[in-house]
């Protein structure tokens, strides 16, 4: 069937597709024809956004239908993608090796419940301290790591 895809900026193209075509496949064809990256496309039919995983027939899109193309700004796409990535990582992650080692040490000295509470508080304090670091603090730390000889000389000068 013949479809017309019209971008809001005025460009348009005619496409020959099957009504069983996936919306995601159509977006790839539109990308080639109108030079709009797939991730920046939002296709609309009668004002309704089309989902990538659905087929054109799911929306009763027939021959000679006209679809509207909204081009999302790249900044918005990147924000959406990073937000989606954050949602995927919200599940509790395994603790890094340093925290695992601290947990083992705490387990030797406290009951399991107390060790867990102490570790949780330690992690909260650590995260809070990190979040309060300024750019100047980070720069100072980096200088100390990159130029330890200067730091030692300064510290010796203060101790006299």
From Swiss-Prot:
The keyword Cytoplasm appears for this protein: yes
Domain Ubiquitin-like: 1-76
CC terms in the record's Gene Ontology section: BAT3 complex; cytosol; nucleus
Cell compartments where the protein resides: Cytoplasm, Cytosol; Nucleus
GO molecular function: protein-folding chaperone binding
InterPro entries: Ubiquitin-like_dom, Ubiquitin-like_domsf, Ubiquitin_CS, Ubiquitin_dom, Ubl4_C_TUGS, UBL4A-like, Ubl_UBL4A-like
Gene3D superfamilies (UniProt xref): Phosphatidylinositol 3-kinase Catalytic Subunit, Chain A, domain 1 (3.10.20.90)
SMART domains cross-referenced by the UniProt entry: UBQ (SM00213)
Start and end residues of each stretch annotated as Required and sufficient for interaction with BAG6: 99-141
PANTHER family noted in UniProt: UBIQUITIN-LIKE PROTEIN 4A
Function (record text): As part of a cytosolic protein quality control complex, the BAG6/BAT3 complex, maintains misfolded and hydrophobic patches-containing proteins in a soluble state and participates in their proper delivery to the endoplasmic reticulum or alternatively can promote their sorting to the proteasome where they undergo degradation. The BAG6/BAT3 complex is involved in the post-translational delivery of tail-anchored/type II transmembrane proteins to the endoplasmic reticulum membrane.
Protein name: Ubiquitin-like protein 4A
This protein's encoding gene: UBL4A
């Amino acid at each position: 069937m013949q479809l017309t895809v019209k971008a809001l900026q005025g460009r348009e193209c005619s496409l020959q597709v099957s009504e069983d075509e996936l919306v995601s496949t159509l977006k790839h064809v539109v990308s080639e024809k109108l030079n709009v990256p797939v991730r920046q496309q939002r296709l609309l039919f009668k004002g309704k956004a089309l989902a990538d995983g659905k087929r054109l027939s799911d929306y009763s899109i027939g021959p000679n239908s006209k679809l509207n193309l909204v081009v999302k700004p790249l900044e918005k796409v990147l924000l959406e993608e990073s937000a989606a990535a954050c949602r995927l990582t919200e599940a509790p992650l395994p603790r890094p090796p340093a925290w695992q080692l601290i947990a083992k040490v705490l387990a030797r000295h406290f009951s399991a419940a107390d060790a867990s509470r102490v570790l949780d508080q330690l992690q909260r304090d650590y995260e809070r301290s990190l979040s309060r670091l300024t750019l100047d603090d980070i720069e100072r730390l980096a200088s100390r790591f990159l130029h330890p000889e200067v730091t030692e000389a300064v510290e010796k000068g203060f101790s006299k």
